[in-house]
């Protein structure tokens, strides 16, 4: 009962976290509920950038890749290497998932560092990078959790749950709690870093001439890429861990 109540409280905590707001948000009223409009708008922009870039790069594929095709093949090879390193020889089916996570977070983070979302005037609220909203990072973390549960169950069936009593049944509560804290650590790490970067850039732009914040923006681009890589690497590591059945 203690483990069950702890798990329920953790899930309730994730729901409560979704109400955290930084800045002025605006909402769409749909039925009896509210939808975070600013997250959807900026997410659609990021998705459009990814789809548009991929379409342009591969619309006329060449045997010997050049230009955009060469760049995207390099990105694909990089994602494959990350997936294979963390998951192992059965990495193939997980490359699309890891790649989607990495590219979405990478472009979202860079949009926060390059695009002045908060300067765009809206009737109500303000825009920000998708990963600047705790709802986005929690959703990505929960998707990762579902992925590694699915990976473990598809590989081992119900025997997957045997990992919770290894190496000793005494660790059952800790092992269960660990699976619920992974989404929290993933989401807070990404949310905190991107939020801090955006706030620093906005403050500097409002206080000093435009040329001064450039070094900070360049640092933000670097850290944004690192955060995307960390998230994707940990997601792949969790999936590989669930398939291997060890910690």
UniProtKB/Swiss-Prot annotation:
Keywords: ATP synthesis, CF(0), Chloroplast, Hydrogen ion transport, Ion transport, Membrane, Plastid, Thylakoid, Transmembrane, Transmembrane helix, Transport. GO terms for cellular component: chloroplast thylakoid membrane; plasma membrane; proton-transporting ATP synthase complex. It is found in: Plastid, Chloroplast thylakoid membrane. The keyword Ion transport applies. Disulfide bonds: none annotated. One of its GO terms (molecular function) is proton-transporting ATP synthase activity, rotational mechanism. Its main location: plastid. It is a multi-pass membrane protein. It holds the Pfam family ATP-synt_A. The chain crosses the membrane at residues 38-58, 95-115, 134-154, 199-219, 220-240. F-type ATPases have 2 components, CF(1) - the catalytic core - and CF(0) - the membrane proton channel. CF(1) has five subunits: alpha(3), beta(3), gamma(1), delta(1), epsilon(1). CF(0) has four main subunits: a, b, b' and c. PANTHER family: ATP SYNTHASE SUBUNIT A, CHLOROPLASTIC (PTHR42823:SF3). Key component of the proton channel; it plays a direct role in the translocation of protons across the membrane. Belongs to the ATPase A chain family. NCBIfam families: ATP_synt_6_or_A. This is ATP synthase subunit a, chloroplastic. It comes from Ipomoea purpurea. The gene is atpI.
């Amino acid at each position: 009962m203690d483990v069950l109540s702890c798990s329920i409280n953790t899930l309730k905590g994730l729901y409560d976290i979704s109400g955290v707001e930084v800045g002025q948000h605006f909402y769409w009223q749909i039925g009896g509920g509210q939808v975070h409009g600013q997250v959807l708008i900026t997410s659609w922009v990021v998705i459009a950038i990814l789809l548009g870039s991929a379409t342009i790069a591969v619309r006329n594929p060449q045997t010997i890749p050049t230009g955009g095709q060469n760049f995207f093949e390099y990105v694909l090879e990089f994602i494959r290497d990350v997936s294979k390193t963390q998951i192992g020889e059965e990495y193939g089916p997980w490359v699309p998932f890891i790649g989607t996570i990495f590219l979405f977070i990478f472009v979202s983070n860079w949009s926060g560092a390059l695009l002045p979302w908060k300067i765009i005037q809206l009737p109500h609220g303000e825009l920000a990078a998708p990963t600047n909203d705790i709802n986005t990072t929690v959703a990505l973390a929960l998707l990762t959790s579902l992925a590694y549960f699915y990976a473990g169950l598809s590989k081992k069936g119900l025997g997957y749950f045997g990992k919770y009593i290894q190496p000793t049944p005494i660790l059952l509560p800790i092992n269960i709690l660990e699976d619920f804290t992974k989404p929290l650590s993933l989401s807070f790490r990404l949310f905190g870093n991107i939020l801090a970067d955006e706030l620093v850039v906005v403050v500097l732009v409002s206080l000093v001439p435009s040329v001064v914040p450039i070094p900070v923006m360049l640092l933000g681009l670097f850290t944004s890429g690192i955060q995307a890589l960390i998230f994707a690497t940990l997601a792949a590591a969790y999936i590989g861990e669930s398939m291997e059945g060890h910690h």
